[in-house]
Amino acid sequence: DIELIREHIDVIRSCNIDILELGFRSLINDQYKGPLAFTRDDFLEKFDSKNLKIAVMVNIKEFENHNEIKNKINRLFPFDSNNSKVDIIRLACTYEEIDKVKVAYQLLKEKGFEICINIMHGAFLDFKTLKDIANSLKKLPLSAIYLADSTGSMDSIEYNSKLKILAQETNFDIGIHAHNNLGKALDNTLSSISIGSSWLDATILGMGRGPGNTDIEELLISLTPKYRKKINIIPLINHSKKWFEKLKEEHKWGKNRFYFLSAKYKIHPSFIQTMLTDSRYSTAEIIGAIDYLKNDKSRTFNSQKLLKARTFFEGKPRGQDIPKHKIKQERVLLLGNSEGILNFKDKLEEFITYENLYVIGINSKSYISQELIDARVFAHPMRLLADNNLFELLNQLIITPYSMLPEKIKLKLKNNNVLDYGLEIERGSMESLKNYCTIPSPIALAYTLATLGATNVKNIMLAGFDGYPKGDIRNQEVENIFDLFRKKYEKINIYSITPTNYFNVSSKSIYGFNL
């Protein structure tokens, strides 16, 4: 939004802030992103940035090898500093990318730009590594060297001790880029001033991916008495209310219990952000994923690692039971978790009793009488760990990959009747083998259908599978599961007896059966 950016520049300038980092400078263009993902010079020409230094960030990981650095730098910055609206370039890198950042620095310095280097993953760097970094960079006339706490897991004591190493080993200005996972971004930023930090990063309302960063309103309020500078922050607060409050509501940055845990275990916040914005993840599954990721050195985001964390099973796929030996009925009613099922509670209970149906519930929710449910399915171990009512299910068969569960969850099931059927995750696949199945994703519905595929069932009725509103892309994952099932198990009839928005599921009405 041009109006937002123009007003933003004016407000930042009015607060006597020295530098405004407007966005990234990047060559990656594999999905739609706004103009500040690229922050090109022709875009910057639209704005008056007089009396304000404009900075952009470049992520060194874009340079996959040394041979392409010069070409990419020239494409990213075709003009020298005299012909560009950019004053300062911040190069973000990891310890492993120091050699590349030095090459990029030299090329950009020749173009006349001020350069800062932003060292990421500060919580993972010990004193020796920080000294190595400082010694490697200290001959470069940098404007500043930053230490970023990418996982937001450091307190002020640890942060200051590491910043002090950089200050002692170089003559550079020191910068701090704090993340707010633990709610300590402001405290860490203010505390760093005592050891000489002079480049203090902050954003309006703490805006930033996931837990966010230091809140600039709070930082300015805290700094005003210290520096005896009268700063009128009313325009900043008005600007924040006009634009950023609704952005925060939309993008939901800011600390919460999940980001707090990620900081404690030094897990990259993008794992948490991805799960929080994906409706498929329940609270139990997020906690389970964190429990997995904390042991897997998850300082950088990886989508495949997240899929593995979502599964959370131990070892190769295996089980001890053959489903058809424990589920012998030919007609099964599968109960979903949609609250719409409450509209049919009485009718369903009457229908189940009259038809003498074998009833399987997904997880532990109960919208009908417990006595009418024969079995329950748990495809994710954290569903079991989170459920404190399993003792009530002693008369219900628990269908789960028992042999693949962690020991602490096995103990929880010691008094339950269990069908131990293993599972393996393989995209685009559904297959029922002797004592384990292959399914496309760790979803209880997929596991249930694959388990039933290993029995002699002929009819599967669905109730409580309302789905999302028509057109919602979240329906696609479930619809893909139904497609895979129908193709693999052509002889099994499957249909819903309550309303559903899944377009590829046949429907009948519960009211149309003869009672």
Enumerate the predicted regions with their spans:
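Catalytic cores and adjacent flexible loops of soluble metabolic enzymes
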Residues: 1-321
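Metal-ion/cofactor- or nucleotide/acyl-coenzyme-handling active-site neighborhoods
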Residues: 317-515
